[in-house]
Structures are given as C-alpha cells and as structure tokens.
Amino acid sequence: MNEYIDSTLLKADATIEDITKLCEDAKKYHFATVCVNPYYVPLAKELLEDSTVEVATVIGFPLGAATTNVKVYEAVDAVEAGADEFDMVINIGALKDGEIEYVKNEIEQVRNVLDGKVLKVIIETSLLTKEEIIKAVEICNETFVNFVKTSTGFNKGASIEDIKLINEYKSDVLEVKASGGIKTKKDAEKFLKLGVTRIGTSNAVKILDDCDCEDCNCGDECNCGEECHCGDKCHCHDKED
C-alpha cells in the first residue's frame, strides 16, 4: 500500500522539525511522495535526495480562488524549487458559474509550465453537485492532466459515492487520487479497491502500522503489541518473535 500514498503535511503551523519527521518517515516506509506547502519544497528535496520519494506541492491551495496568473507563477516557482508533482485547486466558483473555458484554460496554462511533471487537479467534490463533479471530470479528461483529486482536506473529504461517479466519467488514462478523512488502513483499502491509484493522507504512518488483530476477541483493529479497547491484547506478530 505504501507506494500509493502521498504523505501530506499542509498545516499552516508546520515547522522544519515537522517536515523533517515527515520526510524521514517517507524514506522509511517508501511512500510515493510527501506533499508539502511551497515554502518547504527545497527542504523536502534536500532531505529526500537519496531516496525514491518524490516531492509534491500545492497550487492555488486551498481555495482555488487565486487568479490564473498567480497559479502559473506558483507553478513556475515550485518547478524551479525542485517539486516533482503538483496538486492544483481549480477555481471552484468559476466551475459552479459555468465558466468552463476559464477553468480549462487555467489548468492548461499551469500544465504548460510544468515540464511534463505530474499534475493532479483538485475538484473539491464536497462543494459540488453531481452534475458539477461530472463536468469537472470531463474537464480533466480534456486537459490531459494526470490525476483528478477529490479534496483539499479543508472541507469534507473523499466518499465512496464520489469515487464511483468519477470512475464512471473519467477517461482510461486519467488516474484518481482520494484525499480527506482517510485515517485508517480500512479507509484506504476501500478506495484502492475502487481503482484509486493515489491516497492523500496526513495519517500515512498510522495507516501502514494498522494491523488486523486476529487473536482479539472483539475482532477489531489495534496497533501491534498494544492492548485493544476490549481488554485483550494483539498477538499478530508473536509468531515472528
């Protein structure tokens, strides 16, 4: 599962110490990327230079309401800083107003300055109607981006229903990133079973450390070696001792 995870830290109060820990964990668990705010791209690149983990950053985040020129500048700046992947928020209001050409043009302008690097387009599904989600997916198809991404994490996150709807209308080459509210291994598995190829989460380590507590009477999950809430203890790795 690790190769599907974008380990994410986009909080306003993230510190150098926080980003360093994020990158150390990413190297240990071999995540696909770390996703950080633009300010921390150079630091993340330095910390991950001897690893396979890529550095992702955000554009127009989290509202998507910056002008096209600002988003393009953000993209150029992030490319120069060394970012490998880019998660861009569309202009949600413009989409809802039916300004389809504006939304398409903005995506294309950003894509054109990325030197062929991975572009994920965040459509913020929780703020859209079913018809608007369909239109957003069609725009992603037509602009040949790499991923459509469900959420910023600042509103309601991904849902199974949203992913099924996206799958119905996306092209064969458009990949799907689910994000927002994915906190457990079970959460992640639900989306991966639907064909999602990237999971955005700030709980990446917890997700990989989750295990099925086979010997626990309640059949629930707990962290290996720790006591479950039912009072029993996880024995999952006893056979490895």
Language-model features, listed with the residues they occupy:
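Generic N-terminal amphipathic, Lys/Arg-enriched alpha-helix
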Residues: 1-14, 20-27
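Glycine-rich, proline-tolerant flexible connector loops at the mouths of alpha/beta enzymes
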Residues: 23, 27-43, 61-66, 86-104, ...
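Catalytic cores of alpha/beta
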Residues: 45, 66-77, 128-139, 161-172, ...
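Glycine-rich phosphate-binding active-site loops on the catalytic face of alpha/beta enzymes
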Residues: 57-62, 80-95, 142-159, 178-218, ...
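Structural motif
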Residues: 29, 81, 113-114, 139, ...
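Alpha-helix-loop-beta-strand connector modules within alpha/beta enzyme cores
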Residues: 38, 42-63, 98-125, 142-143, ...
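Histidine-centered metal-binding segments
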Residues: 211-241
